[in-house]
Regions:
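Active-site-proximal cap/loop segments of hydrolase catalytic domains
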Residues: 77, 148-363
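Extracellular/periplasmic ectodomains of large secreted or surface enzymes and adhesion receptors
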Residues: 23, 57-89, 99, 337-363
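Cap/lid segment of the alpha/beta-hydrolase catalytic domain
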Residues: 62-95, 103-189, 196, 231
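Generic structural signal for residues in well-ordered beta-strands
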Residues: 97, 143, 306-308
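N-terminal targeting or regulatory segments adjacent to alpha/beta-hydrolase or S9 domains
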Residues: 13, 19-69, 359-363
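Sec-dependent N-terminal signal peptides
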Residues: 4-13
Length: 363
């Protein structure tokens, strides 16, 4: 359905171009623009419906082992208001966060927290992550996942609040703070952050900006160099950045801004939070050269407390260690071993068989 809508929008755009060259067609062009806008709005409405359905699915997939909740919190105001004097301008941005708590948690004890930002550019936290969240909860982790500004499934207004590498970083840290402030079973001294792709990018910037808030981090196939990324992506992708209110220009017109939003160019902020980085040579989304730049930058700055692994042509490309084949599970066990070393969950996996049983029900 989404593809059909996209095709129709393109057809209307084509008609607009043809008609604009002919006199007397202004009213028709305006009508076509309105229809195109309606199609875009429909696309967002369908995203909302899909999100509501997927939220129900969480209970089906994790309800046996986790208390599941979704709460409404705030992050900082928009970096740039379209109407600075308008009603509500300057108000904090409102967004949802997911919470997963082990059903067998003892209210008299405290448990480690994993902050788990989803990928992007525009995306959301959905049941794609089912097995990974099951694996985390089964080890005794409390998990929170922020639907930070720009996330899909919440309408056009939320979608257009995107601030890639900007205030979305604070949104994710706000989810951490909310959990500490509202749940006595969360151990504020045992908080880690883990994410893949844009989620890995957010994990990096959180430990760069808030090093005292996280004991450990994992960044899987993280977007790392936006300047390089704009060079190998197409124009449609570049527009996702230049059209953001907080960025406003393409990379060739504002290199400084894109550099500021690139982890590989900001490694001087890294304060030695234990960090594991994974990348894959056949990644079809985040080219390995971005992560190689990040790794080389960390080394050039003399940073020591990070480890990395560059996997060679692993099946799944960008998704290689989030998939369900055995080798992906073995790689995730390495990730959990890294996190567990610093967060000490009550029931850490000792083998891939433990992971298999927890995530999939059977060995």
């Amino acid at each position: 359905m989404t593809k059909i809508i996209s095709i129709l929008v393109l057809l209307f755009a084509f008609c607009q171009v043809r008609l604009s060259s002919q006199p007397g067609n202004i009213e028709l062009i305006n009508a076509i623009n309105k229809v195109g806008s309606n199609f875009e709005d429909l696309n967002h409405r369908l995203d909302v419906v899909e999100k509501k359905i997927d939220d129900i699915y969480w209970y089906n997939k994790l309800g046996d082992i986790a208390f599941i909740d979704k709460v409404f919190i705030t992050g900082p105001p928009l970096a740039k208001e379209s109407n600075p004097t308008g009603q509500g301008a300057g108000n904090p941005v409102k967004f949802w966060i997911y919470i997963f708590i082990p059903k067998d948690a003892d209210p008299a004890k405290r448990y480690p927290l994993l902050v788990f930002p989803h990928g992007g550019v525009h995306a959301n936290f959905d049941t794609y992550y089912t097995h990974i969240v099951r694996e985390m909860v089964a080890q005794g982790y409390i998990v929170t996942a922020a639907e930070y500004r720009g996330s899909t499934g919440y309408g056009a207004a939320m979608y257009n609040k995107i601030d890639y590498g900007g205030l979305e970083i604070q949104d994710v840290d706000a989810s951490r703070q909310y959990m500490i402030d509202n749940y006595s079973i969360v151990d504020r001294e045992r908080v880690g952050i883990a994410g893949w792709s844009h989620g890995g990018y957010i994990a990096l910037f959180n430990i760069f900006e808030y090093p005292d808030n996280y004991k450990v981090a994992f960044a899987g196939v993280p977007v790392s160099d936006l300047i390089a990324r704009m060079g190998y992506k197409d124009q449609e992708y570049r527009n996702l950045f230049s059209e953001q209110a907080a960025i406003g220009k393409p990379a060739d017109q504002n290199v400084t801004e894109y550099r500021k939003r690139s982890p590989a160019w900001q490694v001087d902020k890294y304060r030695n939070t234990p960090l594991l980085i994974h990348t894959n040579t056949n990644d079809e989304d985040v080219n390995v050269l971005e992560v190689e730049h990040l790794i080389k930058s960390l080394k050039a700055e003399g940073k020591k407390n990070f480890t990395y692994e560059i996997f060679q042509n692993m099946p799944g490309g960008h998704s290689f260690d989030r998939m369900d084949y055995m080798e992906a599970k073995e790689i995730r066990l390495k990730i959990y071993n890294h996190l567990n070393r610093y967060l000490n969950p009550p029931k850490p996996f000792k083998s891939v068989k433990d992971l298999q049983k927890a995530g999939y029900g059977f060995n």
